[in-house]
Design a protein with these regions (language model features):
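N-terminal beta1-alpha1 cap of cysteine-dependent amidohydrolase-like domains
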Residues: 1-77, 81
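Short glycine-rich anion-binding loops that position phosphate/pyrophosphate groups of nucleotides
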Residues: 33, 83-86, 116-117, 158
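Glycine/Thr-rich phosphate-binding loops of Rossmann-like dinucleotide-binding domains
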Residues: 13, 35, 88-89, 121-122, ...
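Glycine/threonine-rich flexible loop motifs
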Residues: 85-94
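Conserved anion/nucleotide-ligand pocket segment
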Residues: 144-149, 153-191, 197
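Class I SAM-dependent methyltransferase SAM-binding "motif I" and its flanking Rossmann-like core
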Residues: 97-159
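Short, active-site-adjacent cap segments at secondary-structure transitions
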Residues: 86, 118-121, 186-188
Length: 200
């Protein structure tokens, strides 16, 4: 399975430019739909364009499953923007896109997860509730993540405006295998294992 997980894609995406140039990217902004600030969505769009990717944008909370399926099947890379982790995992599970994603990743496609898109890869996302408010219409009975990795990404570590909350999560969830990353770091996961890479 190939994953690139980060806090802020437009700051670190160029680290994996070989994986993106001339590739077809399914761009999923769904997590950002419930957020006030969404500047990171535009900056990610801009970077993909600059790196030569062919981008198809799709919102999994409103599109028909058949459309999502055809976009995912056609893509080389599947990218999830940041936003609200609970809203994103709810939409993935509710629509069955979670299983579709796993099927496509099993074919060797690359998933890029930014912030919420990285958080949802963990076995559970309960640890992030202090950073992400659970929506009132959250429809899942638990906080299970996609369980693609055996650790828990903590994005924006010690980075404003998340400095205090990320410190708090590190302390309160010290029993979890947390992997804190700042906005200039990314985690590369492949068959060999995982490593943190950094943008100078």
């Amino acid at each position: 399975m190939k994953l690139f997980l980060c806090s802020h894609f437009s700051s670190v995406g160029s680290l994996i430019k070989e994986e993106i140039g001339n590739k077809k990217v399914a761009f999923i902004p769904t997590a950002s739909l419930r957020e006030g600030y969404t500047g990171y969505v535009g900056s990610a769009r801009k970077l993909f364009k600059k790196l030569g990717a062919i981008v198809t944008e799709i919102d999994i909370s409103t599109e028909a499953y058949s459309t999502i399926q055809s976009v995912f099947e056609d893509a080389d890379v599947i990218y999830f923007t940041g936003g609200n982790s609970f809203f994103l995992i709810d939409q993935l599970r509710k629509t069955g896109t979670d299983e579709l994603l796993k099927k496509e990743l099993a074919k060797g496609k690359l998933m890029i997860g930014e912030s919420a898109g990285a958080i949802i890869c963990a076995p559970s996302i309960q640890y992030i509730e202090q950073m992400d408010e659970k929506p009132e219409d959250y429809s899942q009975e638990d906080d299970a993540g996609l369980d693609l990795i055996d650790f828990y990404v903590l994005p924006h570590y010690l980075t404003a405006p998340f400095k205090k909350v990320t410190e708090k999560i590190m302390t309160e969830f010290s029993d979890l295998n947390l992997c804190p990353i700042n906005n200039r770091q990314g985690i590369v996961i492949d068959g060999e294992g995982s490593k943190v890479i950094c943008k100078d």
